[in-house]
Amino acid sequence: MSTTHEVQNQAPPLTGFSTADDAALLEAVRRDGGGWGEDEIRALGARAGSAEVRDWARMAEASPPVLHTHDRYGHRVDEVEFHPAWHQLMAAAVESGQHAAAWARDRPGAHLVRAAKFYAWAQAEPGHGCPVSMTYAAVPALRAQPDLAAAYEPLLAAAVYDSAPRPPLAKRGLIAGMSMTEKQGGSDVRANTTAAVPAVDGSYLITGHKWFTSAPMSDVFLILAQAPEGLTCFLLPRVLPDGTRNAMRLMRLKDKLGNRSNASAEIEYEQAVAWPVGEPGRGVRTIVEMVNMTRLDCVLGSAAGMRAGLRQALHH
């Protein structure tokens, strides 16, 4: 085929850089007690700017998740299929300690170093930062129920990413999600109608819906439901201890303008099994501990997006 024109005045692809090559970021980390983690941050930043990771980001964004409500034989499965690049990004984020590892790292500046890593890594691909952030944020809320925290916190903090649908306590590492919003209860979750009925074994049966739940393939979720005492926080696993799927039905995925690599689902619960977290009737106070942490990560993610955009513009 003959050449019709010569490509000129086009910037080469932006790759082979470090998102941690940021004087203000590193100065702040050193100043506030996280200097011991600088080498880890630099290594992660170099990986975030590598051709390999930028290709993962491109593929994850170009191939949005797909919902499979049933398998080929007609069995209900409620699974979301992600591009392999999504799982590669998730594994790298978890292995580098951006999830709940900071809670187990008994060292001054652990949360600062984790925040710097999250900021540097989010410049590669922001969508998968959602479940990473929620896993980090779940820990302080879960600590309102010490027995559950003792069982689940080590797995939330483990540097192992395992996407297989198995009982949470049979896995080596967990991802956590959060479900609050209902059709009539977004900003005001007190209007939520999803009901929680006590069972004889201390668990509760959840019936109702959630209108917007991101990362629906998480292993466990902190949710709000109306118990007899009022709005209460619960821990709801995707897979029950006996290996059966919990009764949470993924109705459809949201068609989103941005954040397309990450799935956000509409969910219905048909007597799904969950365990109470914190004081009954004080669910908002309990789950707000998780909300606050995710909002801090929203700031980090937004700053990362602005930094990535600036870098791209300057390169061009």
Residue spans of the language-model regions?
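Flexible, small-/acidic-enriched active-site or ligand-binding loops
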Residues: 244-270
